[in-house]
Design a protein with these regions (language model features):
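Conserved C-terminal structural/oligomerization subdomain of aldehyde/semialdehyde dehydrogenase
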Residues: 1-99
């Protein structure tokens, strides 16, 4: 086990690695879990659980663990280019600037 005195030290130890696929937080303090998970450099984080993954959720890491996410609907974005197309379906007035 790696020991630490303060939460900041635990976060520094956790983030001071080359990889960032997943992280685990064990605590009874929900506020601490939310704060720590926000700062933890990992693509997937479990709180009081060990690698129980719902398959449609995104899978992937950061740093040397890779970029992007795979799994579920998140996979599609890797293989596609998004484009916005807006259609006016009614007869509407286009405002004239300066009038």
């Amino acid at each position: 086990a790696i020991t630490f005195e303060e939460e900041e030290e635990a976060l520094k130890i956790s983030n001071d690695v080359e990889y960032g696929l997943t992280g685990y937080i064990w605590t009874n303090n929900v506020t601490r879990a939310l704060r720590f998970s926000d700062e933890l450099e990992a693509g997937m984080i479990w709180v009081n659980s060990e690698n129980v993954r719902h398959l449609p959720t995104p899978f992937g890491g950061i740093k040397s663990s890779g970029i992007g996410r795979d799994g579920g609907d998140w996979s599609f974005e890797f293989y596609m280019e998004q484009k916005h197309i807006g259609f006016a379906t009614g007869n509407h007035q286009i405002p004239k600037l300066g009038k």
